[in-house]
């Protein structure tokens, strides 16, 4: 019979428990602040009513429905992809001994799964039940981003969770996929629905998702900031990865636009490109501001959260104006 010796590590090598250490968990640390905030803002996809959306969908013309299907297919496939691909980041945080980040990323992953659920419920409600793979798989830029770059940049963390790889993964996942693509797409779609007074269920689900995603963005900015503060060369990694991926993001949007001779909703693409560029530059500015800062200060610096809250206020104001 084996004898258990207190204090000796056992497979798989756990040394102890963060929750049992003297002083417990630091609830003021940035990741746990986001975790607490997310718990307070819980919402249930099955509580949303999509009955009016089904009626409004039937009132759209065929090109508007086709354009909307491109958007929704990209949204839901993206939410499914990020649900799967965030998981190696949890292991990276475990390897770094950052249990607070692990806690937040479990909530983060759950929320991405919930976003997949709510889009699928909406699609079922309006009758989008056929195979929609062509709406994403035929877009070469979408394929490169979501089939290759996103999973590839996250999967490497399973074997090499170095700061450089964490920064590359965060820029890919948070700043390009979530920030430049998803949140900009949600803003554009929300503006279409609000201006036309249609699809109230979609408007509500996008509002809920956007609130979650801004917390995700805050964590991504925070993660890049702490690595930039620790090693200034990581700022170059941020810039390099953004430069690699932004042409793909713009190409993905342009490819969809070229599937239509006339824009079905009459959107001004330049407005949303400017929106995405403005948000990207302000987030990059938040990361750059960590250069030369003591690393220990970053955990208690809530400026990434404040920035995302500011973005939320700006979006709400824009939607109020769009509604008239």
From Swiss-Prot:
Residues 304-324 are annotated as: Disordered. One of its GO terms (molecular function) is metal ion binding. There is a cross-link at residues 82-173 (3-(O4'-tyrosyl)-valine (Val-Tyr)). Binds 1 Fe cation per subunit. Binds 1 manganese ion per subunit. The iron and manganese ions form a dinuclear manganese-iron cluster. Coiled coil: none annotated. Its EC number is 1.-.-.-. Residues 307-318 have a biased composition (Basic and acidic residues). GO terms for biological process: deoxyribonucleotide biosynthetic process. Mn(2+) binds at residues 79, 112, 115. Keywords: Iron, Manganese, Metal-binding, Oxidoreductase. It comes from the Bacteria. Transmembrane segments: none annotated. InterPro entries: Ferritin-like_SF (IPR009078), R2LOX (IPR033908), RNR-like (IPR012348), RNR_small_fam (IPR000358). Pfam families: Ribonuc_red_sm. Its cofactor is Fe cation; Mn(2+). Signal peptide: none annotated. Fe cation binds at residues 112, 178, 213, 216. It is an enzyme of class 1 (oxidoreductase). Disulfide bonds: none annotated. The keyword Manganese applies. Homodimer. Probable oxidase. NCBIfam families: PRK08326.1-2, PRK08326.1-3, PRK08326.1-4. Belongs to the ribonucleoside diphosphate reductase small chain family. R2-like ligand binding oxidase subfamily. This is R2-like ligand binding oxidase. It comes from Rhodococcus jostii (strain RHA1). The lineage of its organism: Bacteria, Bacillati, Actinomycetota, Actinomycetes, Mycobacteriales.
